[in-house]
Structure formats: C-alpha cells, structure tokens
Design a protein with these regions (language model features):
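C-terminal capping/extension segments of zinc metalloprotease domains
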Residues: 8-16, 20-60, 66-99, 104, ...
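Short, functionally critical alpha-helical segments immediately adjacent to catalytic or ligand/cofactor-binding
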Residues: 27, 123-128
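Soluble periplasmic/extracytoplasmic beta-strand elements of cell-envelope proteins
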Residues: 104-108, 124-125
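Catalytic Zn2+-binding segment of zinc metalloproteases
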Residues: 111, 117-120, 129-145, 172-175
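Alpha-helical hydrophobic/aromatic positions enriched in membrane-embedded helices and signal peptides
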Residues: 120-121, 195
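Flexible, glycine-rich surface segments
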Residues: 121-122, 141, 145, 149-153, ...
Length: 247
C-alpha cells in the first residue's frame, strides 16, 4: 500500500508522534558533517550550481521558492523529520538539486519547469539532498591522500546513504517513491545512450532498491511502533504496561 496523501506539516508531526523516542535518534544520528562531503565533491571537480536571479523567474517558478511555496513546505517537513533546519532554498541552473556545506539547497529552475507538477518527484529529490545534510563523515579530515577510485567509492556510499534517508522521509511525508525510481531509470537510460560513464552513483537497480527498501522499512517500523506502543484509541501506556508486566 502506497502512502500517497501528501501530508501537511501537522500530519507529519502526528506521524512522528506515533514513533518511540529512539526512532528519532536513529534517523537523525550522526549528521552535520556535510562540509566534508562538499569537500569531496570539490576534489572530484563538481562545482556548486550557478545561481539564477530570483527577479528573472517566471511567476509560476517563483511561486515554488516563495514563503508558502512547495519547496518551503517540504523544507519544513524535512526539518521536522531530521531536526535540521536547513539553509536557504536557492534557484539555480544546470542542475537538478544540490546542497552546500552551509546546508543551502540549490534547486534547478529547468528541472522545476519540466517536472513542477510531479510533487512526489520533487519531494524525493529534496529528501535525497537533505540526506546529504545528515552525512556521518568525520569532520576535519584531509581526504587528499585517497585515490580517485577511493574518492568515488566514498561518494557512492554518500549517495546511497542519501537515497536511504530519502526513502524513509518520503514515507513519513506521505509521498510515493515510484516517481523517484522512474526518474532515476530515465536518467540512467539517457546516460547510457550518450555513453557517459558514472562513477559517483551506484547503478540504477541498486539505487532503486535502496529507495524502495528504506521506504518499506520505515513503513514497517512505523506500523510496528503503533502496534507496540499505542492502543487502538491511539493512547499510550497500557500496552507498554502489559509488555513490562509480562516480563
């Protein structure tokens, strides 16, 4: 069963309230070492996207970046899930989305023009970038001694972790990962047609599996926590007492 009723911030808060306290520490554990992840990108020759003047945006695209726009609503939900506020959301070009060491999120204007009506996909893309903010790479580490292959392997692991966070976050926000999986498949098809090698990501099948498995794992954890810690009338306490008493 897909979780498709795109949730308001209040509903996301209710979802989190149905989970035991230990869950949050698991989702938000580590985190905050984005500076090193950004440094690895720089070493691999990946500059930050070029900003677009907000005043040059069409009315429809500008609405995405407004205080009541979709991107801000998603930022609030992801902030609630991760306990990370995030930085500014900035319009950019020649990119889908990216995040920098200050947690500023760059979202591609061309991407929004093409896929702006696909809220599931936009949520998945932002959740993936938010996952980079949760990086557990240690701080103040010099990566310059690593070979190119080692740097690419480290980057693939980072991307896999971000996909895993995205899958979990999409469940909690009420979005289906199907659009994200389909988008990755299409990007992979285009890359292969152009015979462009890709070293920084796992293959499409692996990324799709990470997204789907993490989504389903969060759904199972959520449903199990509801059964374990809450009664049918959604009040806590009695079931916990029974479990402790039966021990």
């Amino acid at each position: 069963m897909w979780h498709n009723d795109h949730m308001s911030i209040e509903k996301v808060s209710t979802q989190l309230a149905n989970l035991p306290p230990a869950w949050m520490s698991r989702v938000s554990g580590g985190g905050g070492a984005m500076g090193n992840a950004a440094e690895i990108r720089k070493m691999l020759g990946e500059p930050l996207p070029q900003l677009v003047d907000p005043n040059s945006l069409s009315k429809g695209i500008a609405a995405f970046f407004g205080p009541r726009g979709l991107l801000e609503r998603l930022r609030r939900k992801l902030s609630l899930i991760s306990r990370k506020k995030g930085g500014k959301i900035l319009p950019a070009k020649n990119t889908i989305a990216s995040v920098d060491e200050d947690d500023n999120l760059y979202v591609g204007v061309d991407f929004l023009e093409q896929f702006g009506e696909d809220e599931d996909l936009i949520a998945g893309i932002l959740a993936h970038e938010w996952g980079h903010m949760m990086s557990d790479l240690p701080r103040k580490v010099d990566w310059s001694h690593l070979t190119w292959d080692q740097l690419h392997a480290l980057r693939r692991d980072e991307e896999g972790d971000a996909d895993g966070f995205a899958g979990r976050a999409m469940f909690l926000m009420g979005y289906s990962p199907k659009a994200m999986v389909g988008f990755l498949k299409e990007m992979d098809r285009r890359r292969k047609n152009k015979k462009i090698p890709c070293h920084k990501y796992h293959n499409h099948a692996t990324r799709a599996a990470i997204l789907m498995e993490s989504y389903e794992a969060e759904r199972r954890a959520y449903n199990f926590a509801k059964r374990l810690f809450f009664n049918e009338n959604k009040t806590p306490g009695v079931k916990i007492g029974r479990i402790i008493g039966s021990g």
